Amino acid sequence: GLKKGVSIPDVGDLIFTSESPSFSTDELTDFHTTSRTFSVYYPDTRPDRKEPRYSIVASINAKWQDWQKLSDEDYSKAKNRLCEESVVALEKIIPDIRDKIDHLEAATPRTIQHYTHHASGASFGTKFEGLDVSSQLPDHAPGLYHAGSVGIIMSGWLGTINYGVITANKIDRFLRGK
């Protein structure tokens, strides 16, 4: 989360970054991956707030086996490393972002497993079956929108959040006649 009263430029809603010279599924899931997605939430996603606020979520692929047996000390160090590496990557997009951060935390497969009891800390569920149906609803029934984990090219809790933000913006534009 960013500090009250600060702002950032509009750099897009979803930003995919990687230092990898080429696509590699091994690199994407490596414990030290440089690949991440930033989801940027702007004040216009919550227009009724008295104080405009910004929030940024960094998403990184992870394997349960890399996290499950870490000691508490190593686990804490690895989470701190993820946070720092994410801020460094974000600074390439928003150079002064570090000074604007108010709250920073990391969730891992262990976090997901602890709170959801999903096997091996899995955060994703279904695949893309619902994307076309979901995105075409307003074409068939103006004003009818769907948000959920099957409505975007990612699923589970992260897909639900991201698709919810995208859908909320579409609804806002519909209601405002834009």
Can you name each region flagged by the protein language model?
Residues 55-58:
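Extended, polar/charged low-complexity intrinsically disordered and coiled-coil segments in eukaryotic
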Residues 149-175:
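A conserved FAD-binding loop/helix module that cradles the flavin
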Residues 5-6, 33, 51, 74-110:
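Flavin-binding catalytic cores
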